[in-house]
A protein has these predicted regions:
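Glycine-rich phosphate-binding loop signature in dinucleotide/nucleotide-binding domains
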Residues: 77-80, 131-136, 194, 198
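Short, acidic loop-to-helix structural element flanking the phosphoryl-transfer center
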Residues: 56-84, 90-94, 122
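A short, structured active-site edge motif that brings together acidic residues
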Residues: 22, 103-118
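Conserved Lys-Pro-Asp/Glu-containing loop-to-beta segment of HAD-superfamily phosphomonoesterases
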Residues: 120-149
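N-terminal helical cap/lid subdomain that shapes the substrate entry/recognition surface
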Residues: 1-69
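Acidic, Mg2+-coordinating phosphoryl-transfer loop and its flanking beta/alpha structural elements
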Residues: 141-179
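Conserved H-loop
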Residues: 12, 103-107, 135
Length: 201
């Protein structure tokens, strides 16, 4: 969808350009960087073009990582409340989770607004804590990018990094999560250990 947007604006990308880094941070800023432009208007045009394709096709060009559904199911059975915190617009995030039948495991799905509010992960987490009346000391953030880890830590939330996502090892190490998992099903044991540590302290 990014390639579609830039091509539509007359700024096609070479096939070998890596776009993995665009997953995680606010998309409008990433588009501006790819366009090498300070123009807010141009970035908005690119964002609109991106959504043209993403809303119809790009939404479903995903694959669920192994063990995700089973792990989410077990966590829900153990009475954990699960909230999604994504920089994607909420309307798209909900469609994606419904498509992959993962929505059933989440208490609520929180993302950004199409108008641009809450694309910053720390702002989004603050919003979720307030809306859901959550105690940050009782929460855990699981993420694969520095934005997840740093955004959660800004609110005193313990963080678990996922090594197999879009964040590089260097990026995740610099973000300083409390621990890291290499497979999603390791999350259950990881949370159990964290709960034990919290009881001790």
């Amino acid at each position: 969808s990014i390639r579609y947007a830039l091509e539509k604006l007359g700024h096609p990308l070479a096939d070998d350009v890596d776009l993995d880094w665009t997953i995680g941070p606010p998309l409008k800023g990433s588009l501006a960087r790819l366009l090498n432009s300070q123009s807010d208007e141009l970035a908005e045009q690119a964002l609109a073009a991106y959504r043209e394709r993403f809303a119809v096709i790009g939404l479903f060009e995903n694959q669920v990582y192994p063990n995700v559904a089973e792990t989410l199911c077990k966590l829900k059975q153990q009475d954990y409340q699960l909230f999604l915190a994504t920089a994607k617009p909420t309307v798209y995030a909900k469609q994606i989770l419904v498509h992959f039948e993962l929505d059933q495991y989440f208490t609520e799905i929180h993302g950004s607004e199409l108008t641009g509010e809450r694309t910053n992960k720390a702002d989004l987490i603050a919003y979720i804590l307030e809306q859901e009346q959550l105690n940050a000391q009782h929460c855990v953030m699981v993420g694969d990018r520095q934005y997840d880890i740093v955004g959660a830590r800004a609110h005193g939330i313990d963080t678990i990094a996922v090594s197999y996502g879009y964040g590089t090892p260097e990026e995740l190490a610099q973000a300083q999560p409390i621990t890291q998992i290499n497979q999603f099903n390791e999350l259950i044991e990881c949370i159990e250990q964290l709960n034990q540590q919290r009881k001790v302290s």
